[in-house]
């Protein structure tokens, strides 16, 4: 922690000093504190194992806090952000040393004077899904199951092209793996992906993303192919709908044509009933019978429905106070309550998030 604080202080001081002479540098920050109450009362204060954001129960904690410096001249860009919080502890346990505290670190160069064509390399946010690590930017407080079990971040290089009217963007990615900053030891195969985003109007976004890579050391590695599609529709100034669908496959064993599958639809409705108030409801279903991402050891595997209701109050534009109730209902008894296996889990989560 001392190293992290020293790094953050040095980063902030350096970039603020440079910002006086170089206005193209911008320093921002984000902090979200939360309290989660799990009605199953886990003795280790951890939410179920497939949850990585807001994953601590029956305690007040920091989910995510970061300081970010961004540099952009129009032809060159770079971002560096260091972070702390339970989000970092849960998501970056496999990363070595201070990499556990890197939220973002990338640099890019514009490849064309006339076209919006860029190449970027480093550590950046995932290209999969409509929910990211910054809860304030999402319609609901906590993440859906598919967002929790696809990458929050990735490292590698990407080429991005955007049309001049901003309506279409295409990105091709070369990656070190599935949510990995460093490559898996013993695996020499790179991974990659594609993202296509279409915004015909300011109120509609349609996105398709995929990922193709391998898991495991080379001697036993299996292929993974994942697809994500979603649409965000702001139907009126007050009412919006988000629809998402994920489908993934993974070889059962190397050289086999047999595959395991994962499937997950999700729907979110948001209604802004007053200038500073909003309510949102979510339904989701996640099926991973053979444990590609969520292993249960039960006959039917992970087949779970999720329901949540969210209330938001934004006293000012850069802050939000939120309360969410969430319930999971599983086909098999995959949750624990007082030492017994049960089919359900419910939780209340409250948070305060501020960007600056």
Regions found by a protein language model. Give the residues of each.
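Outer-membrane beta-barrel proteins and related beta-barrel translocases across Gram-negative bacteria
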Residues: 22-24, 28-54, 58-62, 66, ...
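Bacterial Sec-dependent N-terminal signal peptides
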Residues: 1-23
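Residues on the lipid-exposed face of transmembrane beta-strands in outer-membrane beta-barrel proteins
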Residues: 29, 33, 58, 62, ...
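Outer-membrane beta-barrel channels and translocator barrels
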Residues: 22, 72-76, 112-114, 126, ...
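Surface-exposed coil loops of outer-membrane beta-barrel proteins
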Residues: 34-60, 88-104, 112-197, 207-214, ...
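Glycine- and aromatic-enriched membrane insertion/assembly motifs of diderm outer-membrane
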Residues: 54-86
């Amino acid at each position: 922690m001392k190293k992290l604080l020293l790094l953050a202080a040095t980063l902030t001081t350096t970039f603020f000093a440079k910002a006086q002479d170089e206005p193209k540098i911008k320093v921002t920050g984000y902090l979200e504190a939360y309290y989660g109450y799990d009605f199953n009362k886990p003795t280790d204060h951890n939410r179920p194992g497939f949850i990585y954001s807001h994953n601590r129960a029956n305690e007040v904690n920091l989910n995510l806090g970061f300081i970010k410096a961004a540099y952009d001249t129009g032809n060159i860009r770079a971002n560096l952000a260091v972070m702390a919080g339970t989000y970092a502890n849960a998501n970056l346990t496999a990363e070595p040393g201070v990499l556990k505290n890197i939220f973002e670190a990338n640099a890019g160069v514009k490849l064309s004077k006339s076209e919006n064509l860029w190449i970027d390399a480093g550590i950046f946010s995932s290209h999969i899904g409509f929910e990211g690590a910054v809860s304030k930017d999402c319609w609901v407080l906590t993440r859906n199951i598919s967002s929790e079990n696809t990458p929050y971040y990735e490292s590698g290089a990407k080429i991005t092209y955007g049309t001049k009217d901003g309506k279409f963007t295409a990105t091709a990615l070369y990656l070190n793996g599935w949510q990995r900053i460093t490559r898996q030891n013993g695996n020499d195969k790179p991974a990659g992906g594609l993202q296509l985003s279409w915004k015909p109007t300011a109120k509609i976004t349609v996105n398709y993303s995929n990922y193709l890579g391998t898991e495991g050391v080379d001697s036993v590695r299996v292929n993974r192919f994942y697809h994500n599609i979603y649409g965000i529709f702001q139907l009126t100034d007050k009412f919006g709908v988000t629809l998402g669908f994920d489908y993934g496959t993974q070889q059962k064993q190397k050289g086999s044509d047999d595959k395991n599958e994962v499937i997950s639809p999700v729907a979110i409705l948001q209604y802004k009933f007053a200038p500073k108030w909003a309510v949102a409801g979510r339904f989701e279903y996640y099926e991973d019978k053979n444990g590609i991402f969520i292993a249960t050891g039960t006959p039917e595997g992970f087949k779970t429905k999720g329901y949540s209701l969210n209330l938001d109050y934004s006293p000012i534009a850069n802050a939000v106070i939120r309360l969410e109730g969430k319930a999971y209902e599983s086909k098999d008894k995959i949750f624990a309550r007082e030492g017994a296996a049960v089919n359900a889990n419910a939780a209340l989560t409250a948070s305060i998030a501020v960007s600056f």
